[in-house]
Amino acid sequence: LSYNRRMDFASLVACVQASYAAVGRPGRVLLALSGGVDSVVLLHALVSLRKLERFVLSAVHVHHGLRAEADADAEFVQALCAQLDVKVVVVRVQVGPGNLEAEARDARYRALHAQAQQEDADVIALAHHADDQVETILMHWMRGAGGQGLAGMRELSGNLWRPLLTLP
């Protein structure tokens, strides 16, 4: 998320609120919280929005154990969520052999969906934004995807909600 200084936090929350309304005002939102800038910004926006819209907000941090900083990331996320009064679960996953990036992504999405089911969450909020969308479309194009693949990610796909998708 390339932070645009012209967009203040209230405007960001308004964008997330518009997306929230567009996807039907889900009552239970589970945030995929990596601890990176994008997901932390979305966490703060959702905490602010929760005061206006009165939904249940929780978070899940998927711990792949692939980086030396993985434990510190999990501790950071837990401390931040405690400070913001957001329930958080850290889920440890095993990444199989093969394409490490693809295996990690598959393990992450399995963990997200399992946690969403366990919490009866209506949506899983992801912090994908316009830069991620461009990257996705380019990767699909390079792999020879047709028109469907070049469409990119949707704001709501199944129970995956991307409220920042239109933001640079």
Q: Would you name each region that the model predicts?
A:
Residues 3-168:
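Core alpha/beta nucleotide-donor-binding catalytic domains of modification enzymes
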